[in-house]
Structures are given as C-alpha cells and as structure tokens.
Amino acid sequence: MAPPAASGIPSIAPSLGPTAVWLGNRSDLGDVQALASRDLPTTTVTAGNNNKPEHLEYVAFVLVPVFFIMGLLGILICHVLKKKGYRCTTEAEEVEEEEKPDEKIEMNETAHENSDTVGQIINYIMKNEANADVLKAMVADSSVFEPESPMSPNAPGSPTSPGSPLSPGAASLKHNCKGHHLHTVGGVIEKDVCSRCSHKRWHHIKPAHKSKEHRRSRLGEVTVLSVGRFRVTKVEHKSNSKERKSLMSVTGVEGLNGDMPATPVKQEAKEAPATPVKEGTQERRSSE
C-alpha cells in the first residue's frame, strides 16, 4: 500500500507517468518524422525516375500504330482517287537542263580520273584557244619540215589515216563512239580506233536526260494538288478521247453528206427542162 499523501501537497508521481510516456513518444515521433523527411526526396526522385520511362514507352506504343494507320489511310485515299480518274505521284520536280558536250566530257573525266592521264592533260591544254592555235601551228611546221613523216601530204606512199584533229589539212572526220571523252586518234593506224575506247575498263556512261516528256505526253493532265513531292493530277480517260474522236469523225461525215445531196438536186434541175424538149421533137417527127 502506498503511503497516504500529505495534506495540501498534490500527488506528483501519478501525473508524471503519462507525461513522461507522452514526452518519450513525442521524441520518438520527432525522430521518425525527421528520418521520413530526409527520406522523402530520395523516394520522390526514385518514383519520378521510375515513372518517366513508363510514360515514354506508352508514347511509343501509341505513336507507332498512329503512323501505321496514317500510311494505310493515305494508300486508301490514293486508290480511291485513282478509281475516280486522278493520279497520285511522289516524283520530285525535274528541271530540264541542256547539257553541253564539254560538261559531259568533264563528267566522264571525273568518273575515270585514273583512266588516261595524257588525255586529261591534252583536254586541259586544248580548252584554251591560244594553246590550240599554237599547237596547230607547231604541227603544221613539223609536217612541212619533215618530208618523211606520214602526216606530210607530199610524202610518197604515205599511208591513209583518218587524220588527227590537230592536222590542218586533214578532213574533219568525227570519231563515232558511245563514250563521251577526248579521243586519241591520230598517226599511222589502219582503222579509226580510239585508244580509250579499246580499253575494256571504259564504261559507257549514258547521260541521264530527265525530262517531263512522260508528263507532257499525257493530254489533259491537270495538277489538282501539289504538296512537296506529292502530286495529285487529273487524267482524262481513254473513253472520253475516243468519244471526242468519234464525234469529230461524225461531224466530218455529216459535212460531207451535207454537200453530197446538193449535186443530185442540181442534176435533176438540169435534166428536168431537157426531157420535154426531147418529147416535143419526137412528136413533130411522128406527125411529119
């Protein structure tokens, strides 16, 4: 049994028990809250980092079907327009450019830089007109002072050669070749053979003439829509052209038929007065 409390003095022991427990619990809660507050930014950061890739994956899963459906929708629209007489193309606009032979030679020379070095040097020298004139004069002088050279016209028994382009007296014979390049034809040769054409490694480069002839050939083609490289053009059906041709032929026949009946009428008008005259002469002869 506890001793009785003194009069006038309140009992402190029972009151201190709950307060001490409450204070102890409060300190524990404060420590837990502090730890939780310290851990909050880390937890939020990890949660944010974990959610971002998930959102990106969802966006990718959404965008891929959207683009796929848009492509199928475009193909469907093109097929519908084609049935209605339109034509959808994705060809880029081709500009017609007149290529000069010099540009063709340069293109082929760049494609085959190591094919013939001497030919390239001659090409660069002959581009200048002054150098070409001097070279022609030098060739003419050498042909005059060397009577035994095959290029001199007075040399007896000189073999017939096609003539190099540098000789002034030679006839202007063009060397026909599919490859556009500088030809090294000249000297004593039996046939008009180019040294560069004889190489098997020489690939014939055909200049690509991209023009709009295929577009112009189609009559009645009108561009309805043009967005970048995508074009929608209206093309007339062949039946319409055939109907127009048939109408033109019918109108031509009607014009001819309109002129034809005019001639029999004139002939009847000419023959009508002639018949009574003949009958009258026959009656007179019979009466006589």
Swiss-Prot record:
Residues that span the membrane, as ranges: 58-78
Signal peptide: 1-23
GO biological process, one term: positive regulation of p38MAPK cascade
Biased composition (Low complexity): 152-172
Stretches in topological domain Cytoplasmic: 79-288
Keyword Ribonucleoprotein carried by entry: no
Keyword Transmembrane helix on entry: yes
Annotated glycan sites: 25
Region (Disordered): 145-172, 237-288
Gene Ontology terms: cellular component: plasma membrane
Membrane topology summary: Single-pass type I membrane protein
UniProt protein name: RELT-like protein 1
Organism name: Gallus gallus (Chicken)
Gene name for this UniProt entry: RELL1
